[in-house]
C-alpha cells in the first residue's frame, strides 16, 4: 500500500487555515474612526516633537483644478486693462473658490494661485479669507503648501491691523447679496491666530514649514516691514518668489514700511518671545544658533529684542541676548567668547552673529570689538564665512577705530584680491568715504596688488581675461586659507559653507563682485579713483568697446561718466573715444546704456555732444528698427534735434532746468492757465477786501 503523505497534508491544512483567517479579516467591518496617516518627515520637527495628525480637507475635482489652473495663468500674465478689470476677475475667482479655500491652499497645483490671489486682493477680500482660515492655522502653518499661503496672508493683512471693520460696507454687501463682512477686525483675527498657536511655540521654532510663517507673524506684531524683496529682510531668503503686481512702486508698497499696531500687540509679542525661549535652557538656546531652521527665527527674536524693545532689554539677565552672551568683558575663555568663536566660522551661526553685531548696544559692541574681534580682524577677513561678519563690524566702527582697521587690513588686500574676495576691501572703501578717512593707503595697496601698466590693471580689476579655470596657485591659496585661522573642531562639510566656496570660485560671481568693487573705488575722491580713471584713459578703442558691451563691466564706464569724482577734463578726453562707434553701441543692450550716459557726460562739452548727435542722426533707420536703439533715440531727444535744433541745443547745454531736474517742463497753455488763475485769485481777494 502506498504511504499516506502526512507532511503534504499538514502543510495543506495549515495553508487552508491561514487563507480562512485572512478572509475573515477582510470580511470584518471597517472601523468608524478614520485610520491614522503615517507621519512623514514633514510632520515632525527636527527635535522629534510630534505635531499631531494632519487633517485632510479634501481634493479638488478635475473641472475645478482646470478652472483654477487657467485662473493662475491669467494672474501670472497680469495683462488686465486696468485695476478695476483685475479686481472684478479676482472677485470672480473668490466666488468660485467659496467653500474650497482650504482645499486650494493645501493643493500642490493650486496653492500658488491662492498666494497670487491674496497678493492682488483688497483689504475686504483678505478679511473674508482670513476668517475662513481661523481654527485651522495650527495645521496650515505646518503644511508644505498651505504654510506659504498663511505667510502671504499675514504679509498682506499687516497694513490693515489698525483699521476697524466698516458696518456701512457690511450692510451694503448684505443688501447686494454678497458674502457678508466678518465681524472680527484683522487685529482680532491675528489674536485668534496667537490663541491657536499658544503652547506650541517650542516645536514650531524648528518646524520646517511653520518657522517661515512664525517669523512673519512676529514682525507683524512688532509693526516692522515684512517685505520679502528687501535686501536686508530677516524674513526669508532672497530666492523667495514675490507675487503681486510687478509695476508696484516701492514707495507705495505698504508691506515695505513700518506700521502702527494696536497696543495689545506689544504685550502679546513680549509674551510670545518669552514663551518661545523660556522652555529652553541656555545650552539648548545656543544650539539654535547653528540649527538651519531655528537660526532664522532666533535672528528675528534677537533683532526685535534689540531694536524694538530698546537697549534696556539687553541688560535684563533673562533676555535672549544676555542668555546668549552673558559676559560683556569678552575675555579669552569665557562663555561669550567660546560661543562667538563657534559662530564666526559656522555658515549658519555666522548669520546670527551678523544680526547681533548690527543691532547690539554700542557699549556692548565696543567691548566685543576691542577685547575680541580687533586682534583677529586680519584672519577673519581671509575666511569666506567670517568675512561677512567683518563687513558688519566695519559698518559700526567710528572714525578712529576705522583708521585703525585700515592699518590692520591694508596689508591683507593684495592677498584678498588674489583670491577674488573683494567684499571686505569694497566695504572698507565705502566706510572710509562715509567716515571721511583717508583712502591713500588703500590706493597704494591696490597698486601693488595689480599690474603697474594702467591698461592691464583695468583688465585685471574687471577679470576680463579668461577665468574659467582655477589656477594651481589659487588652489594652493584656498587650501592655505583653511589654516589661516583656528576653527572649531566640528565644522560640517555640507550646506552653505560649500555654497560660499563655489560662489567664490565661480567666474561669473567673481566678475560681478569685481565690477562692484571698481564702481565703489570710483566714488572715492583722490588717488584711489585716479587708479581707475587713468586705466580707462589708457584703454584702446577696441578694449573700450569690449568693456562697454559687457553686461557686467559696462557699469564701470557708465559710473565713470556720471559720478561727481569724474572731472570735466576726464570726460572731455574720454567721451571722444566713443565717436565713430555710437551706432554699434546703441544697438547693443549694454552699450546703449553707455550711450545714454554720454548724454549727461557731455553737458559741459557741447561740441562733442553735437558731433555725437550728428552720428546718431545718420543711423536713424537702424536705431528705429531696434528696441534699444529707439530708447537711445528717445533719450537723446533726436526728434527734437531734427525738428527744432535751437530747443535741442538749449536742452543739451543744460539750460532746460525743468527737464534736467527730472520734472516735465510746463507747456505754454499750462503757464497761461497759471497766470489766469493767479489773476482770478487776486481779483477775488480785492473783491473780498472791498466788501469788508
Swiss-Prot record:
Record SMART domains: Pumilio
One matching Pfam family: PUF_NOP9
Organism domain of life: Eukaryota
Basic and acidic residues: bias regions: 11-41
Compositional bias ranges of the Basic residues kind: 1-10
One GO cellular component term: nucleolus
Molecular-function GO terms, alphabetical: RNA binding
Stored SUPFAM superfamilies: ARM repeat
The Pumilio repeat ranges on this chain: 96-131, 132-168, 196-231, 335-370, 371-407, 535-575, 577-614
Disordered: annotated segments: 1-53, 163-182, 466-507
Compartments it resides in: Nucleus, Nucleolus
GO biological process, one term: ribosomal small subunit export from nucleus
Keywords: Nucleus, Repeat, Ribosome biogenesis, rRNA processing
The UniProt record lists the keyword Metal-binding: no
Main function: RNA-binding nucleolar protein required for pre-rRNA processing. Involved in production of 18S rRNA and assembly of small ribosomal subunit.
Family affiliation: Belongs to the NOP9 family.
The protein's name in its UniProt record: Nucleolar protein 9
Source organism of the structure: Aspergillus niger (strain ATCC MYA-4892 / CBS 513.88 / FGSC A1513)
Organism lineage: Eukaryota, Fungi, Dikarya, Ascomycota, Pezizomycotina
Amino acid at each position: 500500500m502506498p504511504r499516506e503523505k502526512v507532511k503534504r497534508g499538514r502543510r495543506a491544512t495549515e495553508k487552508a487555515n491561514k487563507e480562512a483567517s485572512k478572509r475573515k479579516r477582510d470580511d470584518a467591518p471597517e472601523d468608524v474612526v478614520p485610520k491614522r496617516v503615517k507621519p512623514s518627515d514633514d510632520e515632525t520637527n527636527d527635535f522629534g516633537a510630534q505635531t499631531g495628525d494632519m487633517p485632510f480637507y479634501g481634493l479638488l475635482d478635475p473641472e475645478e483644478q482646470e478652472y483654477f489652473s487657467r485662473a493662475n495663468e491669467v494672474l501670472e500674465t497680469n495683462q488686465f486693462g486696468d485695476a478695476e478689470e483685475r479686481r472684478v476677475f479676482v472677485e470672480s475667482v473668490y466666488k468660485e473658490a467659496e467653500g474650497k479655500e482650504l482645499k486650494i491652499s493645501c493643493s500642490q497645483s493650486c496653492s500658488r494661485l491662492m498666494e497670487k490671489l491674496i497678493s492682488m486682493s483688497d483689504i475686504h477680500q483678505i478679511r473674508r479669507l482670513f476668517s475662513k482660515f481661523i481654527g485651522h492655522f495650527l495645521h496650515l502653518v505646518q503644511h508644505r503648501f498651505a504654510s506659504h499661503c498663511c505667510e502671504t496672508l499675514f504679509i498682506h493683512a499687516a497694513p490693515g491691523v489698525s483699521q476697524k471693520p466698516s458696518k456701512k460696507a457690511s450692510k451694503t454687501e448684505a443688501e447686494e447679496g454678497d458674502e457678508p463682512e466678518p465681524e472680527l477686525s484683522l487685529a482680532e483675527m491675528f489674536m485668534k491666530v496667537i490663541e491657536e498657536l499658544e503652547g506650541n511655540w517650542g516645536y514650531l521654532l524648528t518646524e520646517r514649514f511653520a518657522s517661515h510663517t512664525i517669523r512673519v507673524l512676529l514682525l507683524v506684531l512688532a509693526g516692522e516691514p515684512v517685505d520679502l524683496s528687501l535686501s536686508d529682510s530677516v524674513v526669508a531668503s532672497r530666492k523667495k518668489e514675490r507675487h503681486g503686481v510687478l509695476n508696484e512702486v516701492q514707495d507705495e508698497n505698504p508691506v515695505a514700511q513700518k506700521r502702527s499696531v494696536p497696543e495689545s500687540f506689544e504685550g502679546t509679542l513680549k509674551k510670545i518671545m518669552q514663551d518661545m525661549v523660556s522652555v529652553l535652557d541656555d545650552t539648548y538656546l545656543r544650539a539654535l544658533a547653528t540649527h538651519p531652521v531655528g537660526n532664522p527665527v532666533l535672528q528675528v527674536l534677537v533683532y526685535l529684542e534689540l531694536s524694538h524693545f530698546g537697549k534696556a532689554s539687553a541688560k535684563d539677565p533673562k533676555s535672549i541676548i544676555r542668555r546668549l552672551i552673558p559676559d560683556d568683558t569678552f575675555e579669552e575663555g569665557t562663555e561669550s567668547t567660546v560661543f562667538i568663536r563657534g559662530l564666526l566660522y559656522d555658515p549658519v551661526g555666522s548669520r546670527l552673529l551678523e544680526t547681533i553685531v548690527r543691532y547690539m548696544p554700542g557699549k556692548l559692541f565696543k567691548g566685543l570689538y576691542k577685547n575680541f574681534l580687533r586682534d583677529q580682524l586680519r584672519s577673519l577677513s581671509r575666511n569666506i564665512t567670517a568675512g561677512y561678519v567683518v563687513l558688519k563690524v566695519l559698518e559700526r566702527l567710528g572714525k578712529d577705530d576705522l583708521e585703525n582697521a585700515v592699518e590692520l587690513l591694508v596689508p591683507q588686500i593684495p592677498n584678498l584680491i588674489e583670491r577674488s574676495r573683494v567684499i571686505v576691501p569694497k566695504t572698507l572703501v565705502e566706510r572710509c568715504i562715509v567716515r571721511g578717512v583717508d583712502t591713500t593707503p588703500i590706493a597704494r595697496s591696490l597698486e601693488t596688488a595689480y599690474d603697474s601698466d594702467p591698461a592691464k590693471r583695468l583688465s585685471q580689476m574687471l577679470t576680463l581675461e579668461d577665468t574659467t579655470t582655477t589656477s594651481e596657485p589659487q588652489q594652493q591659496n584656498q587650501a592655505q586659507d583653511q589654516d589661516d585661522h583656528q576653527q572649531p573642531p566640528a565644522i560640517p562639510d555640507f550646506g552653505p559653507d560649500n555654497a560660499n566656496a563655489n560662489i567664490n570660485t565661480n567666474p561669473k560671481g567673481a566678475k560681478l563682485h569685481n565690477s562692484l568693487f571698481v564702481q565703489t573705488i570710483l566714488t572715492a575722491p583722490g588717488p584711489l579713483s585716479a587708479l581707475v580713471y587713468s586705466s580707462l584713459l589708457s584703454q584702446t578703442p577696441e578694449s573700450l568697446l569690449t568693456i562697454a558691451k559687457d553686461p557686467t563691466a559696462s557699469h564701470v564706464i557708465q559710473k565713470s561718466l556720471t559720478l561727481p569724482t569724474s572731472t570735466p577734463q576726464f570726460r572731455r578726453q574720454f567721451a571722444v573715444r566713443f565717436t565713430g562707434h555710437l551706432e554699434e553701441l546703441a544697438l547693443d543692450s549694454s552699450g546703449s546704456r553707455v550711450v545714454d550716459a554720454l548724454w549727461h557726460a557731455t553737458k559741459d562739452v557741447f561740441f562733442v555732444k553735437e558731433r555725437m548727435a550728428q552720428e546718431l542722426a545718420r543711423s536713424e533707420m537702424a536705431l528705429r528698427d531696434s528696441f534699444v536703439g529707439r530708447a537711445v533715440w528717445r533719450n537723446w531727444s533726436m526728434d527734437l534735434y531734427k525738428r527744432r535744433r535751437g530747443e535741442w541745443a538749449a536742452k543739451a547745454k543744460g539750460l532746460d532746468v525743468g527737464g534736467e531736474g527730472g520734472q516735465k517742463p510746463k507747456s505754454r497753455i499750462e503757464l497761461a492757465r497759471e497766470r489766469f488763475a493767479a489773476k482770478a485769485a487776486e481779483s477775488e481777494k480785492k473783491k473780498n477786501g472791498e466788501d469788508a
